[in-house]
Amino acid sequence: MISYQTEGVKMPAIKRRETTAWIKSVAATYGKKVGDIAYIFCDDEKILEVNREYLQHDYYTDIITFDYCEGDIISGDLFISLDTVRSNSEMVGATYEQELHRVIIHGILHLCGINDKGEGEREIMEACENKALAMR
């Protein structure tokens, strides 16, 4: 089950049924099934608080993914800062909606085993994001 929640922000205008179906399709391309996934949309201050408390990182970010996957079942809590999504969309010349969908699927790709911190991994992640976005 995929749930969409907010903490301190208004729920973004996403089509939940379509988004859920899209997420399941993307996961299936990696041989994964969707378990329990919670999207928590929040502001910059909340994501900074989560980043400090659980990851000991003292910076803002667009998404934090807590991975609870077991085998081929992907599960996790995904915190998304709508403030950072908005500023990133302006920086990269994308619409807010485009950037939000990129970040939504970025977390799913992490749960599917795609990383973006090591040598060459950022490019692989971007290619996977683009492939997933084309499936929308």
How should each PLM-predicted stretch be described?
Residues 109:
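Conserved ATP-binding N-box helix of the HATPase_c
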Residues 1-101, 112-136:
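An acidic/histidine-cluster motif and surrounding catalytic segment
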